[in-house]
Amino acid sequence: MPAKYHAYLRAWVDALARTGYRAGVYCSGMLVDEGHGVTIITADDIRSNLGKRDVTYFVYNDACPPAPGCVVPHNPPPPSASGIPYAAVWQFAQSPRRKEFTARCAATYNADGNCYAPGDTAHAWFLDLNSATSPDPSSGRGGRP
């Protein structure tokens, strides 16, 4: 990513920290071909440019595997199964399904390409599925009101 983007992120994370908040970023945990033999994972790029700043990473990686697809397991896979060991949240299914990444788990999605909650027979609610390391992975304001 451009240096200006990283400078903005550092300033934003620092500004939040000064007011008692911890930043969280929603970003790709998927390998991307940047061309000319260069590949990146956005989460790794952000993390390496933020240094030791305390940031919560909410990554998406709906590619099957590692994503299980549109399934609601009793014990969902941990965020580290996304391929990003420091992820606090992993979005492993999206609606509508991204066909280029989910061909191996297409059968887990509805025929219309969306993911629905079990029991949603009316298909009223598009569903994205996530797992997290805790019930409150961003820790809110650290307990402050």
Model-derived regions: residue spans:
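Second-shell loop/turn segments in exported
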Residues: 1-4, 13
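Functionally critical loop-and-helix segments that line ligand-binding/catalytic clefts
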Residues: 41-145
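Distinct, well-ordered alpha-helical segments
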Residues: 5, 34-46
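Aromatic-lined carbohydrate-recognition surfaces of secreted/lumenal glycan-active proteins
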Residues: 16-36
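Short, solvent-exposed polar/charged micro-motifs at secondary-structure junctions
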Residues: 1, 35-37, 99-101
